[in-house]
């Protein structure tokens, strides 16, 4: 068999490279759509094809979601997608490293590790940080034991830490370093008007009014039916300077006496207290 000329060999090789279709190559054919996720099959001049993927998809058949669609790369890193695998890697900016570029080669969070006692360091900028402390610790670098952990503030007060000490913000009516002391409002005269008697209560006080006066400070004249004490639509009728009776609606007559008696007991008790 005569040897083939070099020129003929090159011509045959070029023809094969141009027109041969590998057995595994993607092909676009009528009635067959290899591309998924709304990808479009495009044919090359040699008969092979490829899938032109819509935004958000990649891969030979557009079968992968674009892993860079939600860029996980931190600190200015660039997401680089591997289309065939549907995976991505981060190309980090100068000064950062790690799978997601989350580590700085010079930031205090990773060089000096300033957060103590198990605290977590968060980068705020290239050289500033903030520590999230474990329960029981406080301070810029979680260096102090939380003085509020023992709940030193009493009577519903609010505890705040200042350095390694605590400070209590007391509710009205209490005082002291730990808000443990009740303020006796009755030590200051003038709270109760028209001869009312001041009664000290925990964190507050109450005025016991003389007959004929009412209100928080005994500052209002008492009128038995203003406002009406009668319930369920009953009508109040004043029977004396400081007494009343309730006239009930017909549908509540059967239980009206019971309601009236209960209200009268409450009123009589209140009237008795005010005497």
UniProtKB/Swiss-Prot annotation:
Q: What is its main location?
A: secreted
According to UniProt, the name of this protein is Notch homolog 2 N-terminal-like protein B
Q: Which domain of life is it from?
A: Eukaryota
Arranged from A to Z, the UniProt key words for this protein are: Calcium, Disulfide bond, EGF-like domain, Glycoprotein, Notch signaling pathway, Repeat, Secreted, Signal
Nucleotide-binding keyword on record: no
Residue span(s) of domain EGF-like: 26-63, 64-102, 105-143, 144-180, 182-219, 221-258
Record-linked SUPFAM superfamilies: EGF/Laminin
Its family? Belongs to the NOTCH family.
Tissue expression profile of the protein: Expressed in radial glia neural stem cells during cortical development.
Function (record text): Human-specific protein that promotes neural progenitor proliferation and evolutionary expansion of the brain neocortex by regulating the Notch signaling pathway. Able to promote neural progenitor self-renewal, possibly by down-regulating neuronal differentiation genes, thereby delaying the differentiation of neuronal progenitors and leading to an overall final increase in neuronal production. Acts by enhancing the Notch signaling pathway via two different mechanisms that probably work in parallel to reach the same effect.
Task: State which residues carry a glycan (glycosylated).
Answer: 46, 155
- What are this entry's molecular-function GO terms? calcium ion binding; Notch binding
**InterPro entries (alphabetical):** EGF-like_Ca-bd_dom, EGF-like_dom, EGF-type_Asp/Asn_hydroxyl_site, EGF_Ca-bd_CS, NOTCH1_EGF-like
Per the record, the gene is: NOTCH2NLB
Gene3D superfamilies reported in the protein's UniProt record: Laminin
Cystine crosslinks: 28-41, 35-51, 53-62, 68-79, 73-90, 92-101, 109-121, 115-131, 133-142, 148-159, 153-168, 170-179, 186-198, 192-207, 209-218, 225-236, 230-246
Question: What CDD domains is this protein classified in?
Answer: EGF_CA
- Self-association and partners: Interacts with NOTCH2. Interacts with DLL1; the interaction is direct.
